[in-house]
């Protein structure tokens, strides 16, 4: 890589039509260099490739994940002139009360002049992340201004799905989506044509068809995962941007179907569970799993003697949701060195060349984080090639599935916990689906308008 002097030369790009800052006390850039190289008003400054970086950044988060600390250490090792200080609220497990107190501490910091330069926005309430609060920069501006950032190197559909009104306030480090396999002992007898994607309506219809031929202890999903994934998938479709429309016949219909399916659900782990690709008898309709490379990857996209091919779980609006994995990187509007902050975010999601045998001993982090962000296509291909031992056919299918994802699942921790409590009452038939939908509407409207 070429060197461009001690501080490096920045490339400046004028962003037309930027909104005036609603940001709280946003500061201009204070990078080293001449005046015309600084971030001035509507100019977005980025470093040229190979520049020597120097400066200090602060990284704020509730928890520091091992993979993030790993990236911080790698970045400082690669750029000795850079120091990244972490501002972490918790360093271990906490109670719900402590969590809420810590979150309030983080929100108070965000509204002050003591806020960090970069944040992991994963745990922040949705209105802080998405309602134009002015807390965070639109990272699309930096992507567009940086000649060294190529969207084709990333799953751009994920970046687009994470946008709010065309603005990218957070970049997810990685993502996963949900797939399911149906029990072929049931689908073969029904002569059921297995689709590529299914939503709640498809599953409900198949369940009704299967009941007459199924075993007496028939249940939809032995591990109850479907009752977690379906609401997460569907809620996203009814809470878009600042619009809330839970109070609709369509959502009440979704709840009615969920409620009916739930009544047939047996106790957790009633049936023996061994392999997502294997069914015994006709007591279970499906197994759910994520796209993560876990367990045996042999034949992961093929049908087996007792299980169908993987089927993507979608919402009723036809979109394939993704869930974030790892961090959601955000640049504070008060960041004091935005060009340097962008270099760090870009580094965290960029291509990495890792020695697989030197991976973290923890299999979870070894598989999904040690090799860099799965948002980067080449990182994913490296991992797939390693896990699948150059199984090109499976790797191509993996790529095709990743490219189909089009929607970010609604999952705000605070609101999600409120809605879950209400939904549980509906599932237990303490309230009707219509009452549940109305309560959802009231609580969600209050929440997004706070």
Please report, for each region that a protein language model flagged, where it lies by residue:
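C-terminal motif of bacterial Sec signal peptides marking the signal peptidase cleavage site
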Residues: 23-26
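Hinge/lid segment of periplasmic solute-binding proteins
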Residues: 38, 42, 121-177, 305-314
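Short, well-ordered beta-strand elements
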Residues: 40-65, 71, 82-89, 118
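Mature extracytoplasmic/periplasmic domains
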Residues: 51, 66, 327-412
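Extracytoplasmic/periplasmic substrate-binding proteins
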Residues: 69, 253-343
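Extracytoplasmic "Venus flytrap"/periplasmic binding protein-like
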Residues: 81-153, 189-190, 284-285, 302
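Helix-loop-helix "hinge/cap" segment bordering the ligand-binding cleft or interdomain interface
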Residues: 143-146, 158-227, 231, 237-269, ...
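C-terminal capping/gating helix-and-loop segments adjacent to ligand/active sites or protein-protein/ligand interfaces
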Residues: 323, 381-450
